């Protein structure tokens, strides 16, 4: 990755979750303030880390989305949550969302939301 935040970078795109922009900004600021040496998008070995004399090492590898074993999952009309949130693939008008966890709800909210996010417009927020 070329920026910190991981899944927050997806979540901040969901209407009503724009506060994650601030979460990422806060952590960037704190890392800078504390002089934390952050290195992104690097492959390292144990020897690389040992030889640099760090006091502590945090390895944040991120996640790999789970792909369910469902017949047809590889069909061109099937869109994963990352592509849906990032707007990489068009989403039709009739959609089945598989999964009732937080990500399923976020994708549903994103693809059914019309107009400006209430979190960004006080007048819209007051009407919701």
What are these regions (language model features)?
Residues 1-4, 39-50, 61-74, 82-128:
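Rossmann-like dinucleotide/flavin-binding elements
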Residues 6-54:
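N-terminal Rossmann-like dinucleotide/flavin-binding domain of flavoprotein oxidoreductases
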Residues 78:
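Gly/Ser-rich helix-loop-strand patches that form or flank binding pockets
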């Amino acid at each position: 990755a070329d920026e910190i935040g991981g899944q927050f970078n997806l979540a901040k795109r969901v209407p009503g979750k724009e506060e994650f922009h601030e979460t990422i900004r806060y952590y960037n600021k704190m890392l800078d303030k504390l002089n934390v040496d952050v290195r992104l998008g690097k492959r390292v070995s144990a020897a690389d880390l040992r030889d640099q004399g760090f006091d502590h090492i945090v390895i944040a590898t991120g996640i790999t989305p789970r792909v369910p074993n469902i017949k047809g999952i590889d069909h061109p009309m099937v869109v994963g949550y990352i592509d849906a949130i990032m707007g990489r693939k068009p989403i039709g008008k009739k959609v089945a969302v598989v999964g009732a966890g937080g990500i399923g709800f976020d994708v549903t909210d994103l693809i059914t939301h019309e107009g400006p996010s209430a979190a960004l417009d006080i007048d819209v927020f007051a009407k919701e």
